[in-house]
Amino acid sequence: MTGLFITLEGPEGAGKSTNREYLAERLREQGVDVVLTREPGGTPLAERIRELLLDPSDEPMAADTELLLVFAARAQHLQQVIRPALAKGCVVLCDRFTDATYAYQGGGRGLSIERIAQLEQFVQGELRPDLTLIFDLPVEVGLARAAARGRLDRFEQEGRGFFEAVRQAYLQRAVQAPQHYRVLDAGQTLAQVQADIDALLPSLLEACRG
């Protein structure tokens, strides 16, 4: 069985984590070996970096610092989890990856896309996701869902303009490379979103079986 790298992306409150679990369950029902992971994080060291990135109580973080911490966590994650799992033929389902960097640090923070691309090449080499699922929904809906979860992290405390830029950056990437992306309407009911995921299963299983 061929290793497959699938990332799940979207703004706050889009339901990525819930739907990642659902997709993993559906793949495992078909005998697929699935590794679930997330960014920032995925290893003990990368999770410590995640805490720095999300903690709203720390000193104000410069945008460049944020970008470099994201890629530092990613480098560790790739070496310790993602590359070994793909080499074993697993399907890796990752909650956020480099598209999130282009969306949040590029779109939201306004950092240079060229700089992000340079770091992407340095850290990842030629490794890119085989498929990215973007869970899209109106910003106000996502922020309301995030607020309902309780205490907001450092990113969730950003204003609406930030998240509008994040959303548009995601959608622009999907337009630029439609063969690598599927945009799902995360504003639907959970059952409807999962029906859309089910519709993708045959092609995913075919790719897994090479």
Curated annotation (Swiss-Prot):
Coiled coil: none annotated. One of its GO terms (molecular function) is dTMP kinase activity. The keyword Membrane does not apply. It is an enzyme of class 2 (transferase). Keywords: ATP-binding, Kinase, Nucleotide biosynthesis, Nucleotide-binding, Transferase. It holds the Pfam family Thymidylate_kin. InterPro entries: P-loop_NTPase (IPR027417), Thymidylate_kin-like_dom (IPR039430), Thymidylate_kinase (IPR018094). Gene3D superfamilies: P-loop containing nucleotide triphosphate hydrolases (3.40.50.300). ATP binds at G10, P11, E12, G13, A14, G15, K16, S17. Its EC number is 2.7.4.9. It catalyses: dTMP + ATP = dTDP + ADP. It comes from the Bacteria. GO terms for biological process: dTDP biosynthetic process; dTTP biosynthetic process; dUDP biosynthetic process. GO terms for cellular component: cytosol. The keyword Kinase applies. Phosphorylation of dTMP to form dTDP in both de novo and salvage pathways of dTTP synthesis. PANTHER family: THYMIDYLATE KINASE, UMP-CMP KINASE 2, MITOCHONDRIAL. NCBIfam families: DTMP_kinase. Belongs to the thymidylate kinase family. This is Thymidylate kinase. It comes from Ectopseudomonas mendocina (strain ymp).
